């Protein structure tokens, strides 16, 4: 009885310590991501999930980081493993809260990344699924700049399906999701108005401007982007791609 009472009285302290641990680990995970050291950040957020498997913030972070880290890999199996993990983390978060804006956004990101190298048929199937998640994300948080970026990419990719892909999709499904370059530009611009430090979004917006024959806007966007400090491990490579695009435009 005495042992039981000691245990019961100690429970609030144990929960308090656990909560403090999670707050500290979250701060450290965010710090590592901002360094940026994305592998270390990923491991830190996984530590949180060991303590609290239903921590939605950490599930979302693990999903997003897996999508980013996976994209930089060179081995196809490793790439696929990261993308599967990204979808798994997002899926767990969505089971906890189906309307969580960030969870829907990171699921859309994971699906988008994993469909980049797929065939036309698979790309169309993924496109339908991505649109569901990105629409739900924006509906629940209209200020989610990453979701607007994904919507821009969705429109850009669908608007650029070649004739064979579009014809095959129509034969298979009767219709295909409608995407357009102009809608892509609107979504990318919206993302920039919410967060003006998202380097990938600047690059994709510049590409869209260039494809839409708005050369001056593309050049201005790239030059502005090159002045923004790097925030992710992908940013240096994105800037190099942007410099090459700038030379091509000029």
Question: Which residue stretches match the model-derived regions?
Answer:
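Short coil/linker segments at helix-helix boundaries
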Residues: 32-40, 65-99, 106-143, 153-191, ...
